Amino acid sequence: MGRRARGRRFQQPPQPEGEEDASDGGRKRGQAGWEGGYPEIVKENKLFEHYYQELKIVPEGEWDQFMESLREPLPATLRITGYKSHAKEILHCLKNKYFKELEDLEVDGQKVEVPQPLSWYPEELAWHTNLSRKILRKSPLLAKFHQFLVSETESGNISRQEAVSMIPPLLLNVEPHHKILDMCAAPGSKTTQLIEMLHADMSVPFPEGFVIANDVDNKRCYLLVHQAKRLSSPCIMVVNHDASSIPRLTVDVDGRKEILFYDRILCDVPCSGDGTMRKNIDVWKKWTTLNSLQLHGLQLRIATRGAEQLAEGGRMVYSTCSLNPVEDEAVIAALLEKSEGALELADVSAELPGLKWMPGVSQWKVMTRDGQWFADWHEVPQGRHTQIRPTMFPPTDLEKLQAMHLERCLRILPHHQNTGGFFVAVLVKKAPMPWNKRQPKVQNKSAEAREPRVSSHVAATEGNPSDQSELESQMITGAGDSETAHNTENTESNEKKDGVCGPPPSKKMKLFGFKEDPFVFIPEDDPLFPPIEKFYALDPSFPRMNLLTRTTEGKKRQLYMVSKELRNVLLNNSEKMKVINTGIKVWCRNNSGEEFDCAFRLAQEGIYTLYPFINSRIITVSMEDVKTLLTQENPFFRKLSSEAYSQVKDLAKGSVVLKYEPDSANPDTLQCPIVLCGWRGKASIRTFVPKNERLHYLRMMGLEVLGEKKKEGVILTNENAASPEQPGDEDAKQTAQDPCVPDSVPGCDAAAAEPSR
């Protein structure tokens, strides 16, 4: 039977126009298709209400407010990237232009609430409004504001993030020297906050600390990479492991192998998500207590694994978007009991003034899906022991329970500050975990040589933290056969010799997910680097050993850079970790680079990291020069100011740095520095800046972008456009062939732009 015949065989008979389909909730089908859309989800769940009323986590007299807030849509929130020097300028632009335009504005009969700052977030860098994402996307009255949000989000200057999810990174108290592990990082909004805190001092291109962001889902790891890339940090590594058995890493310290313990750990575990009902309305019809019972064990294993890898004196934040004590206090109580005093709950009540929260509870009951309650483990019948575990109940020893101080946990209720529901607990490590006390902190070289390496697949499938600890204990004490030790020793020596961090040469179990390109550090004697060093007059302090590529064969097209600390992690753990991405792009090969003195041009992604080390080919430009460079495709030298022209005319062709320094004596001008990558051609100059970043700089300088569609090109006047007879055309042709050239700026012209400041 042919394909068409098969299709006709199973076709439904035609339905008369306007006839109702009972299977689709009474919707009618007309000529234009289904009318009325899908039936709305009823925001009711009797089991949910019965469960939480019985637990009494909502204060007396507030239940109706609590339920009413859950049925309301979640307000939109945004956070300004705090570490960037442009944060104040973005805040100024938001408050004095976009927010003012929202005053007295109505959309679909609803008055638009002017965004207000979150009272508990520092420096007014987080704001919320009653505008939902749907209204922002659909309303033409808000098109300009929506375009601003999308563009600035892509540039990494703004993050649209739920208010309560901003809390855990703030409570970690991150400092630039901290080594941080984000155990369940995707989609990455909290990870970006952690990166911001590492780069609090913009004058330091390479902080001593770093963030290792992990997620068990291989596909979500790439979403995580996209989020992290917006911040252009050399101190972030994305890895793909099961958080409950994430491998313990080692680093080289003065020739010795030391176990890597983290100063800060974010443990934002998978949960039932009943605190997200305001945005995930599916939870209303799918919620049962079975979700929490099934997740409790995984949550406890992840938290235990995090506690094992936390340094003494370090801080770990455990968080969920669930209000259920089985996922919250029960996990914390079980972890504290297992730690035997090694962990304690920190009192963070004064750390976020303005935040409203409820203290953790010390008594709760467990309910099954069919509504049966149990107050104690001994009440649970034998047939339910696999579903309900002892760790789901509060400790029976009242003295031990009081010593845990579960009231120090924070539970955020939706109706208190118009947010989602959330739970946070901050743990401090006072001593090694009881089962880790016998493990030596430092491994010598002979012990390391005997250490059997574990493939990432084995580590990712190990489910029990205690078993994992036992395995690591054997690894550290040197258990393993001599053949494995011999192979490991050879592998390590090869790693140090060629700097390749990729799959081991010996046959290993196949990893799941996509195969990643290797991370190959460039040897210090590589002939590729001296021309770069000479062309840009790099400072002697430039850490050239931190440069890497993603290929072992052929020409190196792109050079990336990581911090010294992440290089140490990569070189010593290549067989333990499945690394998805790390490093930022700092140089790209030119298509015809051999014609110039240097085959590599600068990449905008890494320019703020590289700039402190560059001593040549820097052109200081004015604000008007920046406007010209960002709104015209290939402006001739004569379009620049006399100061900039005098600098550029004597330079050889090739990549340049364009630097704008703010004038403090003129407060009406842009008050933050700008560093751009450019190309000095034969008679013209251009910038290599991505589209959204261009739009960002233009807005900060008071120019309004007029076009909205991506297909609208740069509006160039006749005097700006280079004709085929003009000398600038050769440069335009050269840059047009370069795959790294960014998109044009849509609908933006310096002459037509209207001031917004």
UniProtKB/Swiss-Prot annotation:
E.C. number(s) listed in UniProt: 2.1.1.-, 2.1.1.203
Record flagged with keyword Cell cycle: yes
Phosphothreonine: residues carrying this PTM: T717
UniProt region (Disordered), positions on chain: 1-35, 436-504, 716-757
Coiled coil: none
Binding site for S-adenosyl-L-methionine: C184, A185, A186, P187, G188, S189, K190, D215, D242, D268
UniProt superkingdom: Eukaryota
Induction: By Myc (at protein level).
Main location as per UniProt: nucleus
Tissue expression from the record: Ubiquitously expressed at low level. Up-regulated in tumors. Dynamically expressed during morphogenesis and in adult skin: in adult skin, expression is up-regulated in the bulge and hair germ as soon as the hair follicle enters its growing phase (anagen). During anagen, expressed at highest level in cells of the hair germ that give rise to the hair matrix.
GO CC term, one of those recorded: mitochondrion
Biased composition (Polar residues): 463-476
Subcellular location: Nucleus, Nucleolus; Cytoplasm; Mitochondrion; Cytoplasm, Cytoskeleton, Spindle
Phenotypic consequence of gene deletion: Mice are viable but show male sterility. Mice display reduced body weight and partial alopecia; alopecia is caused by impaired stem cell differentiation in the epidermis, leading to a delay in initiation of anagen. Mice lacking both Nsun2 and Trdmt1 display a complete loss of cytosine-C5 tRNA methylation, leading to development defects and impaired cellular differentiation causing lethality before P3.
Positions bearing N6-acetyllysine: K585
N6-malonyllysine carried by residues: K585
Reaction catalysis annotation: cytidine(48) in tRNA + S-adenosyl-L-methionine = 5-methylcytidine(48) in tRNA + S-adenosyl-L-homocysteine + H(+); cytidine(49) in tRNA + S-adenosyl-L-methionine = 5-methylcytidine(49) in tRNA + S-adenosyl-L-homocysteine + H(+); cytidine(50) in tRNA + S-adenosyl-L-methionine = 5-methylcytidine(50) in tRNA + S-adenosyl-L-homocysteine + H(+); cytidine(34) in tRNA precursor + S-adenosyl-L-methionine = 5-methylcytidine(34) in tRNA precursor + S-adenosyl-L-homocysteine + H(+)
Regulation: Inhibited by magnesium ions.
Chain ranges passing through the membrane: none
tRNA-binding among keywords: yes
First-level EC class: transferase
Covalent link location (Glycyl lysine isopeptide (Lys-Gly) (interchain with G-Cter in SUMO2)): K46, K510, K515, K585, K639, K653, K659
Family stated for the protein in its record: Belongs to the class I-like SAM-binding methyltransferase superfamily. RsmB/NOP family. TRM4 subfamily.
Oligomer and partners: Interacts with NPM1 and NCL during interphase; interaction is disrupted following phosphorylation at Ser-139.
Name by which UniProt lists this protein: RNA cytosine C(5)-methyltransferase NSUN2
Originating organism: Mus musculus
